[in-house]
Amino acid sequence: MDIKVNTRPAGPKAHAVEVQGEIDVYTSPRVKETINELIDQGRYNLVIDLEGVRYIDSTGLGVLIGALKKVREHEG
């Protein structure tokens, strides 16, 4: 499975996580790692760009929901 995950600034206080490919049980750890790195750096205002995602399974959805819960704890 091929996936690309990139980050970039998306405004003065926000960062975008651009994902391309398929998010499944094999690729979701990469997405989770990227998001968690931003959260660990204190970046809580995230935009997750899924325009390039062709498929997402329940594992991928779980990663996104987990990230949402983490950033909401910090009013992100």
Where do the protein language model's features map onto the residues?
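STAS-typified acidic loop motif
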Residues: 4-33
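Amphipathic alpha-helical interaction surfaces in cytosolic regulatory modules
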Residues: 22-76
